Amino acid sequence: MPSVSTNQIPKGFRAYRPRALQWLGRTVLSFLGWKVNGGISDEHQGKKLVVVLAPHTSNWDGILGVAAIAGLDAKITFIGKHTVFKYFALGAFMRYMGGIPVDRTKPGGIIQDAIDQIRKMNGTLIGMAPEGTRSKVKEWKT
């Protein structure tokens, strides 16, 4: 049984990236022992959905998340620390996969950036880790 499949999401949420990238995402997840369960039903087609990803406690979360996005071939927008995007090749790849750099040092910056991005979307998903950090926290940032 594959770790993830494009059949888990409706066609309207697919990014139609190269099959080699989809295969790479599935292979990374499978190799690391991860599997994506569930999916998104067709009734959500054309709607704006927010996917909450928690807990975010490791740098591996980003690697696994991008692998899942690739394996699903999902059109998912996700928020990431702006410093990750400053490296040319990594930044370009992260943007290609749906990443949006946000500067967490600006007061209210991440919230306004997320609101601005959600308003621009039409029938896509946004994934965010509400803790705002990889450290273990007792409650989410609001």
Annotate each language-model stretch with its function.
Residues R14, F31-T142:
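Soluble catalytic domains of membrane acyltransferases
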